[in-house]
Amino acid sequence: MKRQFWLVGIVLLAVLSACRSKSDGPTDTYSSGVISIAADESFEPIIQEEIDVFESLYPLAGIVPRYTTEVEAINLLLKDSVRLAIATRTLTEEEMNSFHSRKFFPREIKLATDGLALIVNRDNPDSLLTVRDFSRILTGEAKDWKDINPNSRLKSIQVVFDNKNSSTVRYTMDSICGGKPLATDNVSALKTNQQVIKYVAENPGAMGVIGVNWLGNRSDTTNLSFTEEIRVMAVSAEDVATPANSYKPYQAYLYYGNYPLARPIY
């Protein structure tokens, strides 16, 4: 996914060049000026990395990011508080009409493909999961680990998200649960992806749902492994998960469409 994010730099250049003050001439150019952007917090690691590279290439340019929920990122764009919003969905017809009524004509550009990662405690022996069973867990049909694996010694499944207004919650409700509401007794939301990782690392029965960008192993310069604090589950689109048909959210599996919990970034 990282390789596709060179588009972010191009988008930032385009946004900078489009910014104009009310003075006689432009105050922002392709290589100078300051803009504010908003991004879903699940993308913070990769977006911040791209901003750092961009600003090192263009020292007179400044990008002021605001990492928040997807809902808030879109709202900030609607209120003209930021020049760019990075999210996992396009604008709705109502949102687009709001812009058009004010003579604004925003562009939607697909930047990359992201993946949702399912993480569990390192003491949890379960490493495979089907999309169907993931849906059963989210809707409350499967509440204990034995409902997924009869041999499991763990008890209840505690699912934790980063934020109730995040793109991960919306994606699971729309794309995994088919619009059904999430269970309220075993599904909860914290505030950030980092808090989810910490919670899962400390609770054997927990399952975290986070953006794959937060799982990078800082000691691995090849970016081919995940953080060792937790375990990343392999997910299958088939009825029965096996090592042969289950995939972890590595870049190659996202790119070729093998990983079933993939989503676009706009």
Segments from the language model and where they lie:
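Short alpha-helix boundary/capping motifs
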Residues: 3, 82-84, 104-106, 227-229
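Sec-dependent bacterial lipoprotein signal peptides
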Residues: 1-17
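Conserved catalytic cores of soluble enzyme domains
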Residues: 107-111
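Short acidic (Asp/Glu) patches
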Residues: 100-104, 249-252
